[in-house]
Regions:
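Glycine/proline-enriched, intrinsically flexible loops and inter-domain linkers
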Residues: 1-170
Length: 170
């Protein structure tokens, strides 16, 4: 979940929240075919303001589109529409949690395992859902084949932070 993106565009924020949770689980060795999502949503009090009503609608549409694009469905969630106190409002918030059942032999962790291991950055050709799904499929295949010893998804943190965390480990 990226609060800065969600404040600017609730649709994009929710879409990216789903993408990030799916990518993290793929990087951990789980397959999208076995994944499910659950959401936690927080929004300002809607009152009678049509613009306020549009924020949760946009977020839900973004999350729905991501589910369709990545073939992963949500099985539940919890929402709060009372995220306001006097003049303070929470940013539009849709947090996505991904879970899956998988084979323990496929589970990977992000820390680098040994000196001399090859480090590879895999990136999508573009931001189209088909390109993202092809990248997920390739990662699922490489992890299943035992080629990947460590794997991490960079998400909003960026590549540099992800590499430092992989190098430092637990």
């Amino acid at each position: 979940f990226n609060p800065y993106l969600s404040a600017l565009d609730p649709y994009a924020g929710a879409y990216m929240a789903v993408l990030d949770s799916v990518a993290k689980l793929v990087a951990t060795g789980f397959e999208r075919a076995n994944m499910y999502l659950t959401f936690q949503e927080y929004f300002e009090k809607l009152r009678q303001d049509p613009e306020r009503w549009g924020k949760p609608m946009a977020a839900v549409l973004g999350a729905l589109m991501a589910q369709v694009d990545f073939g992963v469905g949500a099985i539940g969630g919890k929402d709060s529409m009372s995220g306001s106190f006097e003049d303070l409002d929470v940013p539009p918030t849709l947090v996505s949690f991904a879970t899956a059942i998988g084979n323990i032999d496929r589970v990977t962790s992000p820390e680098l395992k040994a000196a001399g291991d090859n480090l590879v950055w895999i990136s999508c050709q573009d931001t189209l859902a088909s390109s993202l799904c092809a990248t997920f499929d390739a990662m699922e295949h490489l992890i299943g084949a035992g080629v990947v010893r460590a794997c991490a998804s960079s998400g909003a943190a960026g590549l540099a932070e992800t590499l430092v965390k992989m190098a430092v480990g637990n």
